[in-house]
A protein has these predicted regions:
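A short alpha-helical cap/connector motif
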Residues: 1-135, 139-161, 167-213
């Protein structure tokens, strides 16, 4: 119980620190990230696909499968899935690979972005050539996250995007997130607290952003 309580405290501390230090669209000096924030991350307009997929969520009673830290994380499941959908759709990927995802609703949102979604460890064999979007759900260890990163790194191209859910899950994951940010092929990262975005854009200065959502 003491360990659980400490983990809970650390998570809340990280959340509050992120809220204090993160910027809005107006605090970014990158045209790419400003547009992403303004037109995608902060696009809160209702969409017909939301109605369909939230009906699916109710049918599956999927909230029990959402990986998170307490009520605050569970209450964000709907908003986070819709954010993932918007980012994926804006990115226009042809091939998406998803790993460590326990949520059927998240899979449905990814599939709705008009991509060919592959699941699980067989995905690398099934997807030939490059991977446009890699979605990694809630990894339990930093070693597993880094294993996925380095396994798929040869498949990433300049237009690829890696989405990592739960980048503040524990100290291991936070350390792995820092290692990913420092990698020479990574040019832009966007820390949305609940999820991290990793870009490999060529010709762009290395920058890291924390955006408030």
């Amino acid at each position: 119980m003491l360990i659980f309580a400490t983990m809970g405290f650390n998570f809340i501390r990280d959340y509050l620190k992120h809220r204090i230090t993160a910027k809005t669209r107006h605090g970014t000096h990158s045209p790419f990230v400003y547009k992403l924030t303004d037109e995608v991350i902060y696009d809160f307009k209702p969409k017909s696909i939301y109605i369909l997929l939230e009906t699916l969520r109710k049918k599956l009673s999927n909230d029990a499968l959402i990986q998170g830290k307490g009520t605050l994380a569970r209450n964000n499941s709907r908003r986070l899935d819709q954010l993932i959908y918007r980012i994926a759709k804006d990115h226009r990927p042809v091939h998406i690979v998803e790993l460590e995802n326990a949520s059927e609703v998240t899979t449905a949102y990814l599939a709705a972005s008009y991509a060919s979604v592959k699941e699980g460890e067989t995905a690398l064999k099934e997807v030939s050539g490059t991977v446009d979007l890699l979605y990694i759900g809630s990894c339990k260890t930093g070693a597993l996250l880094m294993d996925y990163f380095y396994t798929y790194l040869p498949r990433f191209h300049a237009g690829s995007l890696m989405m990592v859910k739960g980048i503040y899950t524990n100290e291991e994951i936070k350390a792995s997130w820092k290692e990913i940010k420092a990698h020479e092929r990574v040019t832009v990262t966007v820390d949305l607290f609940w999820i991290g975005l990793v870009y490999f854009r060529k010709g762009q200065a290395k920058e890291h952003f924390k955006i408030k959502i």
